Amino acid sequence: MTAFRRPARSAAGALVAALAVTAIAAPALAAPTADDLAVPRYAHVFVIVEENKDYAQIMDGANAPAIVRLAKAYGSATNFYGEVHPSEANYVALVGGDTFGIHDDDAFFCMPAQDSGDCSHAKTPGYANHTVDAPHLGNQLEAAGLSWRGYYEDIPAPGSLATFATAPGGEAGGPNAALYASKHSAFLNFRSAQNDPHRADHLVGFSRLDADLASGNVPSFALVVPNQCNEMHGAHGPGIPADCDWNDPSATIRRGDAYVDKLVRKIQASPVWASPDNAAIVITWDEDSGTRVGCCGSDPASAANFGGGHIATVVVTNHGPRGVADPTPYNHYSLLRTLEDAFGIRTYLRHADDSAKGVVPMLPLFRR
């Protein structure tokens, strides 16, 4: 396991840093559109993120019958795209509205020219600081008096700053054999999350997810990230199960599909699903297998959106529409904008504000 620890800082220093984030990168004030205003308020939204699969690999149904069943019964965004490759920046885009120039899977603490095995691309020209001084969705929610939490299967401990980790008692190994990977955290790339005094309550494991669902005490926004065997990413090395080997994508899809089905059923069995309040589960992917197609302002020269491929995205709601196949072009910025609307936040983070480029809320899938 590789871990990173920052030096302790004073309370005054933490306050100055927090104020700097707000001052440097406050979200643009944009007038919401009629569609933004039409998105109903949601009490709870769970976003489950899977990995590295093309739209057709999932939606042809051969290896993902549970996900296809959910798509047909509830709703599917049939033209949804990632922003870039590889994984890490798409997670950052989902909660921050930008890739911030990150175009690799180096650790969240990496800086230009840094000598570290976790920062293998750091001497590449134009390398971006992987710790971002900008607000994220969690900051917006807290400012609105709402709650958020990231649930990560096999995170070593609540609030952990480990870059990779195996499950307790699991096989030792490096990144290729890791079950938990901080590159899929989304939030840890933000300085405010790294320095969050409540980080151990905001970045937690799946035992906390089980407890929260059983009690019904779940946050407004929940990012749910299975381990690399259960999110279709796969792994490679000694002790890796056959259905987790990334050289067998059909097997990793079947395993991930069964796991997503279990997660969705668990959420639907929670008291929050039976509530009169609106709740939703979004199942999406970070990127496809490597194509550079995109939407909503995608440009080969864009650091924020050069195209992360056509990916499946399914929206399951407790009170919303049924049987919807929505062909509107969307990406993770569209999903972020939809989340902001659903929680009554009318300021859109960075590229979530790109309505002129086609970044619009996913209203047909969330309307009631």
Stretches with model-predicted labels:
Residues 30-368:
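N-terminal pro-sequences and low-complexity stem/linker regions of secreted or lumenal proteins
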Residues 1-30:
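Secretory targeting and sorting signals
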